[in-house]
Every structure is written in C-alpha cells, then in structure tokens.
Amino acid sequence: MKCPKCNSTHSRVVDSRHADEVNAIRRRRECEECETRFTTFEHIEKRPLIVVKKDGTREQFLREKILNGLVRSCEKRPVRYEQLEDITNNVEWKLRDEGRAEISSREIGEHVMNLLMHVDQVSYVRFASVYKEFKDVDQLLQSMQGILAENKRSDS
C-alpha cells in the first residue's frame, strides 16, 4: 500500500476492524518512512455485473446510480440516508446472488421499487414516475391506485 504523503510502499497495519459496510475491513496504517497514518478499506472482489438498458445498450452496474436515484426521489421526505443505502445494498446483493452476468435495467428498477414502497410511498411514486416514464396523469393515477389497494390488503 502506498503512503499518500511520500509514496513509500512500506507501511504497517496499526489497527484492523470490520467497517460499517458489509464485507469490508478498515485498516489503520502507518508509513514506516514518514510515519504518516492513513486508512484503507479492504473489500471482497466482486464479479462485474452488466446492465442491459431499455435500448439494448450495455454498461457496467454502478450502485451509485441506484443510490443517486433514491436520493432524488426522497428529497424533502422523512427518509434517512442509511435507509437508502440499505435498499441499494439489498438490491445489489439480490442481483449478485442470482449469479447472472447480465441483468436488465427493468429488473433493477422493480427490485428498487419493491423495497422503496415499504419505506416511503411518496418517494416510491416519485421514483416510479421517472422509472416507468408515465405518459400522462392517468398512468400515474393507476399506479397510485395499486398502492392504495396494496395498503388495504395489508391493513386487513
């Protein structure tokens, strides 16, 4: 590991512990040359996931895109950032557990919406309105009626 100050490759681990992230280890290191302390994170190497978009193009899966979309849909809503990270983590785990190399953007959106609906329904409608590309208010109302029907079933 290179020291961020002097670029020396000689450092020693001062402290190791599990990070807040899943499957990560936080290591506190000290450079043996300049004695600068710095932190590194060790993660399990993940096989790349390829997302097949609606137009057929392919790109590498980026969890940040899910998180950014969730943050936008939850603006000014009583949703904690940690909840959005949990949704993002759950979606990524589910996709990786399926063991496929390629996944459609439609499937990713469905996973996100299923989890978001249980966190905040207004944020769900915001996310769905962008994801599903509603053409008019009638389509949006149909989606909202589906939520209301789901609420009635779960309340019974």
Curated annotation (Swiss-Prot):
Q: Does the keyword rRNA processing apply?
A: no
Where in the sequence is the signal peptide annotated?
Answer: none
Q: Where are the zinc fingers (unnamed)?
A: 3-34
Cofactor binding notes:
Binds 1 zinc ion.
Alphabetical keyword list: ATP-binding, DNA-binding, Metal-binding, Nucleotide-binding, Repressor, Transcription, Transcription regulation, Zinc, Zinc-finger
Domain ATP-cone: residue ranges = 49-139
| MF (Gene Ontology) | ATP binding; DNA binding; zinc ion binding
Q: Which InterPro entries match?
A: ATP-cone_dom (IPR005144), NrdR-like_N (IPR055173), RNR_NrdR-like (IPR003796)
Q: Which cofactor does it need?
A: Zn(2+)
Q: Which biological process annotations from GO are given for this protein?
A: negative regulation of DNA-templated transcription
A Pfam family it matches: Zn_ribbon_NrdR
Q: At the top level of its lineage, which domain of life is listed?
A: Bacteria
PANTHER family per record: TRANSCRIPTIONAL REPRESSOR NRDR
Instruction: State the family it belongs to.
Output: Belongs to the NrdR family.
Q: What does this protein do?
A: Negatively regulates transcription of bacterial ribonucleotide reductase nrd genes and operons by binding to NrdR-boxes.
According to UniProt, the name of this protein is Transcriptional repressor NrdR
Phylogenetic placement of the source organism: Bacteria, Bacillati, Bacillota, Bacilli, Bacillales
Gene label: nrdR
